[in-house]
Amino acid sequence: LAAHTLPSARSQGGPLTGRVNPPEGAYFTGVVAGDVEQQFVVASDAGYGFVTSLRDMVTKNKAGKALVSVSKGGIAMQPVSIYDLDHEFLAAFTNEGRLLIFPVRDLPVMARGKGIKIINIPPSRLAERVEMMSHVVVFSEVDTLQISSGKRSLSLKIDELEHYRGERARRGLKLPKGFQRVDKVERIRGDE
């Protein structure tokens, strides 16, 4: 949708379904805006994902278009902005408190599809929905990741995150006790 066609901030807004016609049972997991060349990580909670541009998300079809293929029972996640594909990192968290960090450039650039494995989740645990990818964050070396668990938060800089760095599609390592139930992850930009 062109942003200038949306209701102004003075109004009550309006439902997205008034402007698009999603298939039966479909729902929105996120909204993105930006330049057509802006890149995003698109992923599912099954632990798969890829990099795509806003240009590949745009369609003239009111019913939309298929962008990400999700495993049965899986859920597409909110797309995450990439500012520098060659120098940023991807942090993948599971609901079991595992964290894996690797360069975001390790993901393929695709127009649509399932993508490749970001973090390894045992198939039996994934099928039963016991374990899944819960958060994806893209960050740079100067940024800090703030991990919130309940009322507590933990801020980690790049040198503290080195412990969780590994190859894409690995299992990831457990976060410290007390922070394994991750409610929210925030990128605190270091260049501001």
Task: Set out the residue ranges of the language-model regions.
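Short, structured "edge-of-domain" segments at secondary-structure transitions
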Residues: L1-E192
